[in-house]
């Protein structure tokens, strides 16, 4: 069994998965979505749930730096509700403050990736960081693995 880590944006969802033991997170893919058209990519998530034996979801919670919750937190929670309704699997949330900044820094400073290429992988990397932080903190869903 694995956990899927999701970095939910308004146009894409970055996806990462844990290894079966819950020690490491690896990038999987980016799923295109369109919040305005209410297209959430759940068909692709369903394929991943089935093929990867998913036990639960960890969604990034993009809180503000002062710990308040803005509209993106509401959107992430709504996506979590959609997942729970569709799949009946447990959902947990991980504070994702600065994960995108950390991902950018990793891509630019450590990997010297061009801006054009960054756009293609930034959401996957952010999802990986969200899930790895969750696994490192032994979140409640880790017991499901």
UniProtKB/Swiss-Prot annotation:
InterPro entries membership: RNaseH-like_sf, YqgF, YqgF/RNaseH-like_dom, YqgF/RNaseH-like_dom_sf
Highest taxon in the source lineage: Bacteria
Protein's GO biological process: rRNA 5'-end processing
Keywords on record: Cytoplasm, Hydrolase, Nuclease, Ribosome biogenesis
Gene Ontology CC annotations of this record: cytosol
Protein known as: Putative pre-16S rRNA nuclease
Gene3D superfamilies in the record: YqgF/RNase H-like domain (3.30.420.140)
Family affiliation: Belongs to the YqgF nuclease family.
Biological role stated in the UniProt entry: Could be a nuclease involved in processing of the 5'-end of pre-16S rRNA.
Compartments where located: Cytoplasm
Annotated EC: 3.1.-.-
Xref: Pfam families: RuvX (PF03652)
Species whose genome carries this gene: Limosilactobacillus fermentum (strain NBRC 3956 / LMG 18251) (Lactobacillus fermentum)
MF term (GO), any: nuclease activity
């Amino acid at each position: 069994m694995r956990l899927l880590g999701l970095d939910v944006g308004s146009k894409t969802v970055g996806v990462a998965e844990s290894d079966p033991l819950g020690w490491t997170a690896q990038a999987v893919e980016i799923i295109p979505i369109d919040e305005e058209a209410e297209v959430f990519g759940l068909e692709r998530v369903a394929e991943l749930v089935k093929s990867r034996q998913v036990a639960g979801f960890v969604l990034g919670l993009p809180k503000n730096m002062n710990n308040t919750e803005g509209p993106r937190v509401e959107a992430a929670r709504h996506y979590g509700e959609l997942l729970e309704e569709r799949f009946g699997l447990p959902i947990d949330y991980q504070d994702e403050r600065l994960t995108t900044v950390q991902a950018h820094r990793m891509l630019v400073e450590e990997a010297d990736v061009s801006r054009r290429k960054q756009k293609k992988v930034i959401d996957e990397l952010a999802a990986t960081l969200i899930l790895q932080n969750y696994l490192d903190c032994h979140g409640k869903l880790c017991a499901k693995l």
